[in-house]
A protein has these predicted regions:
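N-terminal, polar/charged subdomain of small-to-medium soluble alpha/beta proteins
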Residues: 1-118
């Protein structure tokens, strides 16, 4: 399947980081998602019930990251990927989480993972 549903630039404010001062503040994460989804059914039915609800996906990603409050971006990525596959039945995904400002000389740092089969 070559169909992909996108969520790009999802901003999530959460506690994340390994330093004591980071545990006392929220920081912005930027999340990009590519999720395999057969779009032929919703295209034919024109019914949102047949589609991957990207608003619900976005809300759950935000909730997951805000509840988790991880130290590492890697931990955050694995938790989000697992949740999306379990809760939404996404067979394959590519997930990027960026933490802008984490390294002063860089625009952003982050991780990108792929899970599942296309």
């Amino acid at each position: 399947m070559a169909d992909v549903v996108l969520v790009e630039g999802l901003a999530v404010e959460t506690v994340i980081g390994v330093y004591d001062w980071e545990r006392e503040i929220t920081q912005r994460l930027l999340v990009d998602l590519e999720m395999a989804w057969d779009n032929r059914v919703p295209a034919a039915s024109d019914d949102v019930a047949d589609a991957l609800d990207y608003a619900a996906v976005s809300e759950r990603v935000s909730q997951c990251l805000q509840a988790l409050q991880p130290q590492l971006i890697e931990t955050a990525a694995e938790a989000v990927a697992t949740m999306l596959q379990q809760d939404f039945g996404v067979s394959w995904l590519r997930l990027t989480i960026n933490k802008p400002g984490a390294v002063p000389a860089a625009t952003s740092v982050g991780v990108r993972i792929e899970r599942g089969q296309r």
